[in-house]
A protein has these predicted regions:
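N-terminal secretory targeting modules
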Residues: 1-161
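Conserved SGNH/GDSL esterase-like catalytic core that processes O-acyl groups on lipids
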Residues: 28-30, 151-251, 259, 285-292, ...
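Structural recognition of the beta-strand scaffold that forms the well-ordered cores
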Residues: 129-130, 177-180, 229-234, 278-281, ...
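Short loop/turn segments at strand-loop or loop-helix junctions that form parts
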Residues: 131-134, 140, 182, 233-238, ...
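A structural motif corresponding to the C-terminal end of an alpha-helix
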Residues: 165-176, 265-277, 301-304
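Generic structural signal for well-ordered alpha-helices
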Residues: 262-266, 296
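Substrate-gating cap/lid alpha-helix
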Residues: 276-334
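Conserved small/polar residues in nucleotide/adenosyl-binding loops
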Residues: 340-342
């Protein structure tokens, strides 16, 4: 039994490209589609486009997590997720583990001939959006033996958005999540690590649904499709590349320019989301404190009850590598407590 992606019994969450409802494109980490069904088997047909790293999709089937490797070959491929299940009710959440190092087109699910698709569980009413970098995507999060250490060599196999502090926090608060984050990205173009050697910044990507020109046509995002209650800014760490001008001179013209752009970006999104609360932060990834001091300065300058600056207990000094699962759990605990009291 084929289940088309536009079947109303499927539940989606994330900034997803639905220009073709029968072939939606998952771009951002933590984007997912959920299906409730009866039957003994389930497969999914996907088309993967890869820019770098090996591509893996994640899933939660009846509460148990798994993953599978995607082919880099062009065209559609069908992947068996489960066989020989008990003939009872099942819930599958298929999610994007990684950022736009690849994009995935969903072409449908395949169930057994005697299966039934059930009404989806409703999404939570509370909504969160995170504009961040690789930490917010859960990059290299599964390399738990390297907690507090530099990253091991890898090809993307340790990256899992399920274990990002962002998705953990959303689950803690029973909230939807749009994890509008990208590994390596900085605020400004020509800085950071994303899209080497020209480097695209958040200012060029935040209002796009597809923004990776190596993989697809760049498309604008319709902000009316998702209105968050809480918006988290979690960037300012990749901005020190190719040179850490903020650490070198807090009062330089470049440093002041960054603060001005950060403020303009914040004030713009405050207009786009006029009722949202904004949390300005970075992470525990090692970086110079002048970036956080700059964010505090912007927060004080904007001087709005809707805007809060948040620092983790190990902010900027927790680890030289990416955040591993236990570190993300601690970050999520601290951030969740902060959001509960706002």
């Amino acid at each position: 039994m084929h289940i088309s992606p536009d079947d109303k019994r499927l539940q989606y969450c994330g900034r997803i490209d639905f220009d073709n409802p029968k072939a939606p494109v998952l771009v951002y980490a933590a984007s997912f589609v959920q299906i409730r069904f009866t039957g003994t088997q389930i497969s999914v047909t996907l088309e993967n486009k890869r820019a770098y790293w090996s591509s893996r999709m994640g899933y939660i089937l009846d509460g148990k997590q798994g993953q599978f490797l995607l082919t880099s070959d062009p065209g559609a491929e069908t992947y068996v997720i489960a066989r020989d299940l008990e003939h009872t009710e099942h819930t599958l959440t298929l999610f994007k583990r990684m950022d736009s190092c690849h994009i995935v087109t969903l072409l449908g699910f395949e169930l057994g001939s005697d299966a039934k698709v059930l009404t989806p569980a409703p999404l939570p009413s509370r909504k969160i959006e995170v504009f961040g970098d690789s930490v917010s995507c859960g990059e290299v999060s599964e390399a738990v033996d390297y907690a507090g250490k530099p990253d091991p060599e890898h090809d993307g196999e340790y990256s899992n958005s399920w274990y990002s502090y962002a998705w953990m926090t959303a689950r803690n608060l029973h909230a939807q999540l749009h994890d509008t984050s990208q590994g390596g990205i900085a605020l400004l173009d020509k800085t950071g690590w994303f899209m080497d050697p020209d480097y695209l910044g958040i200012e060029s990507c935040y209002d796009k649904i597809e923004y990776q020109p190596e993989l697809s046509e760049v498309k604008p995002w319709d902000f009316s499709r998702y209105t968050p209650d809480v918006v988290i800014f979690a960037f300012g760490q990749n901005d020190n590349h190719p040179d850490d001008y903020m650490a070198e001179d807090y009062n330089s013209a470049r440093s002041e320019n960054w603060r001005q752009h950060y403020r303009r970006f914040l004030e713009h999104l405050m207009e786009v989301y006029p009722k949202a609360t904004f949390i300005l932060t970075t992470t525990i990834l090692e970086h110079n404190e002048n970036w956080d001091i700059s964010i505090e300065e912007v927060c004080k300058t904007v001087n709005s009850p809707r805007v809060h600056h948040f620092l983790y207990s190990q902010n900027g000094k927790g680890t030289p590598g990416h955040i591993r699962i236990p570190e993300a759990e601690q970050m999520s605990k601290e951030l969740t407590l902060s959001l509960i009291h706002i």
